[in-house]
Amino acid sequence: MLLLPVPAQTICHLFCTVIDNYGDLGVCWRLARHLADEHALAVTLWVDDLVSFQRLAPDIDSAQSSQMLGKLCIRHWQGDAVDATPGDLVIEGFACSLPASYIRAMAARSSAPVWINLEYLSAEAWVEGCHGLSSVHPGTGLIKHFWF
């Protein structure tokens, strides 16, 4: 199992693009709540479709660009416009593409964040060999870790 070091006061930004059937959003929402509740991380869940999110979490106000839901900060993710200091831990839900401006801000940090690409669950044989692999971003040198 790959264990990545994270700071004691960890700020986590989790990005989710809603594709279909709420599966991606459901997994990201559960993961965000788990990280906040069980590991005391300060989690911001960036979601591109708050109307769909409201169907899973009726307390979401789809008209608000930023809101708290329990311990989570929920932010409406609209294209490349991400106005936030990158977290210590950055998770791409299911290979969604992080905004270029956010990646540049990640690279500008004094210490690089832990960057995880959360991938789909699979029982295929190749997955075990890919879990935990890393990839260097060609423009920034940041390292992304793949988590299956």
Go through each PLM region and give its residues.
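Glycosyltransferase specificity loop/lid
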Residues: 2-89, 93-96
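Short helix/loop capping segments that flank catalytic or ligand/cofactor-binding pockets
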Residues: 23, 99-101, 126
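Hydrophobic helix-cap positions at the C-terminus of alpha-helices
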Residues: 35, 106-109
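Short, aromatic/basic amphipathic alpha-helical patches
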Residues: 55-66, 102-106, 129-136
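Short beta->alpha connector loops
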Residues: 95-98, 121-123
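Internal, well-ordered alpha-helical segments in soluble enzyme and binding-protein domains
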Residues: 98, 102, 144-147
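Active-site-proximal region of nucleotide-activated glycan assembly enzymes
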Residues: 108-148
